[in-house]
Every structure is written in C-alpha cells, then in structure tokens.
Amino acid sequence: IPPSESGYREAIVKDFEAVFTAENGYEAKTFYSLKNDEQLAAAQQFITDGVDYLLISAAETTGWDAVLQSAQENGIGVFLFDRMIAVDESLYTAAVVSDMANQGKLAVEWLKGLNLEAYNIIHIQGAMGSDAQIGRTDPLVAQVNAADNWKIVVQQTATWDEATAKQIVESVINS
C-alpha cells in the first residue's frame, strides 16, 4: 500500500481496501515501491501466483509491455489507477487515472493569470519518469521555452514527499 501522497491516493486505496476483502471473495496482495523494476518484478510474481486482477499505479510510464502481455496471456485483468502507462490500450481493462498533462496546463494558465513581470519558478517534481512527472512538467517546460520572462531556478524531485519538498524550497530561499 502506498504512503499517503494525496487525498486522491488515500481515498482510492481506502476504497480498494474496502472492496477487495475476504468477505467479498478476494484475497488481496499488495506491493509498494517507487522503483519501476521492483514494481515490474512484483507484478510478474503476482501473475506467476495466479492472481485474477492486477491494479497498478506505475512508478514509470515505460517498461510494462512484457508484464502486461503476460497478464493478458494468463487471463488476468489489468486496471490502471492514478497513473497512466505507455502501452497499447489492449493490454489493460480500464484506466482510472488523472489527466496529468491537463493538470500541468492548468497550473501554467494559473501562473500566467498572475501577470507577473518575471516568473522565477521552483519546480518540485514527483518520481522521475512517472506519468505525473512527465505530464505536469511538459506544459511548464513549453511555457518556459516560449517566454523570456519565465525561468526555472530549481527543478528537483521530492518523490512525493512533503518534507523533502519543503527542504528544497527552504534551500532555495536560504541561498
């Protein structure tokens, strides 16, 4: 089970825990890691164990083709949640994910609406290579490249950790 990264994540995990219970006829197995290779290995082990479903919130968007193909070949339903994976749509049953690119676009539009003379941005990202990191970053980078008064002064990952994000901001303020 992942740590509480957001209210959305907390709610969806709570819902999964309420639905996928022994009382409802499920034997739930969970695995959490921010490392894609560890997630891939765990998913492959779950396939070997003969699970009926894989519910995946991927650390990274890539590297999942072979595992999801294996799941499909073994009749295992795959559901993506929270984050998208860059694979053929036929390899998963459904995706209940956020539109990360739209979130990035909305953030950029909000910043533009401030009508500042200069934008000196501390860009704190999630796990590198994740759908959230890529989708939210691309609109910002496009705007920075298009406007002379937009500058990213620091761009670092906090890997979904609020304390790390605060440390990054404090170090920029104190420098």
Predicted regions and their residues:
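A residue-level marker of the well-folded mature domains of exported/periplasmic proteins
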Residues: 1-175
